[in-house]
């Protein structure tokens, strides 16, 4: 049987068992990662899995069942079991469950890829990490680490509404970090971010990062941080680099606009949300420079796809427009509860997990400035970049972030390097203070977004650029 035949058999079995709606996903995923430390290969991981996951809706209740077997008998049994779980749950009825309509697509989609990352010889990939980490050690790092990761995923999706979709998504990326120790301090510098850069692309992304070319600089900067002055405490103008702003978006916007959190359906890992649907369309989230979109169509970004795991097509939507909150991340059922006309943001971490609302590419639209112009316009402030620590409350409201590095900004010039820079604030007040935003957008990839019970790891993208925020508390000590 083909993968589509397996999924179709599961859906039909669920319908025969009483489901009013059913869908099934066959997923085949290959994963590879390699890490190096101090000029030597540390670990190689290669994994492959394939299986079937089935959802069934009976009354107001969902059921789910997954199996690592693609026979017709296993598929039919999975469909029946998903329907049986939903039927049992429906004995204690909850609120009605409706699904926002979507076109019944019959389609194929694939992410862009110039160089198949799994086709690159292991020796070449390992040599890259060995040379990069070895160079960092030669330039003074006490600990030099490098990593790449690759995911190669094919999905086949069938629904009782007529969907028949296959997608092939390649994701890869990597990065390096240098850690130096001395005088009671431990300092780290990373490239291109503290966890690397990732996208729905091929090995060409890793090549473009030039890990070896940046290795000496970040090792030397990690040592320089050991003797740099501490970031001063107080209120000042804060300039954030794009990588740090990407995490700020992830934590204080992305999770907050997940509709399942807003409705109180989900609280694991990141709590619920301070947002209230009665204020959708009217709440002032940030300054007029703040334009945030939900856009899974960005070529090469980590949160991109052709269709989500409910068969909804990838569509760009506004989340915040000119500072006003106007959109959410939603699934078909949560959107119906909220009276919205769209889903499109539901994905699962593999065939054995139930699809849930996840971030896609949630990020800022470009501003009118450059980083140099922002620095030139700042009389007294601090520039910070690359995340080191994060803390945010269970409403996604109060936060404190630490960065790897800071620089003093005085009279329009970047000055001394600062160590242990931190800043704190309250989400909407912080975003309302943004008064300059660069046009230099990069879709930063986050491959480790945790959510759900049992836990799932999502891959998300966050287009971001340097920006300035006024009168921010910095240098906060724990």
Question: How would you describe each model-predicted region?
Answer:
Residues 1-478:
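N-terminal small-residue-enriched
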